[in-house]
Design a protein with these regions (language model features):
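All-alpha prenyltransferase/terpene-synthase fold signal
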Residues: 1-169
Length: 171
């Protein structure tokens, strides 16, 4: 019985590795893309962070001998929690200080990742800031001061609050 559950848990983790890899490839192919839509962004974070949370919850339930309905419920919970976590993490990358984060603020911006706060701010400032976004995100031509400006535009556009609101829907 334990061996069967262990093999099932390994299968869950192997499948999660496949999905996460596909999510990473999708994110890499859409890096620097200011036209990334919200549905694709959510697909990326579902395939990466949320899949990891879901697989951990599901494998734990399998290992504990939970019944199929509990296993499914825990997997669904892990998926929702993973989406909420990643949305909040993406918002905090622009809305918090490095001290509060425990890591560098602005890493997503500096890596050219099209996260939801950035995408919302781009859409909300489209006409007047298009050249800035094109230079810093699409072309990757950033100065040390550009993160400060991007942060101001993102916060000023309400993108942080909108991203956190979406995060709360998933909890």
């Amino acid at each position: 019985m334990v061996e069967t559950d262990s093999m099932r848990a390994l299968g869950i983790l192997a499948e999660a590795s496949r999905v996460i890899s596909e999510g990473e490839v999708l994110q890499l192919t859409r890096a620097h893309d200011l036209n990334l839509d919200q549905a694709t962004y959510l697909q990326i974070i579902s395939a990466k962070t949320a899949e990891l949370f879901a697989a951990a919850a599901e494998a734990g339930a399998v290992g504990a001998g939970a019944d199929p309905s509990a296993i499914k419920a825990l997997r669904d919970y892990g998926m929702a929690l993973g989406i909420a976590f990643q949305l909040a993490d993406d918002a905090l990358d622009y809305g918090a200080t490095a001290e509060a984060l425990g890591k560098n603020a602005g890493d997503d911006f500096n890596e050219g990742k099209a996260t939801l706060p950035l995408l919302l701010a781009v859409a909300r400032t489209r006409g007047r800031e298009e050249a800035f976004w094109e230079r810093t995100v699409t072309k990757g031509e950033r100065t040390p001061e550009d993160f400060t400006r991007a942060r101001e535009l993102i916060i000023g556009s309400g993108a942080i609050g909108a991203t956190l609101d979406l995060s709360l829907i998933h909890i």
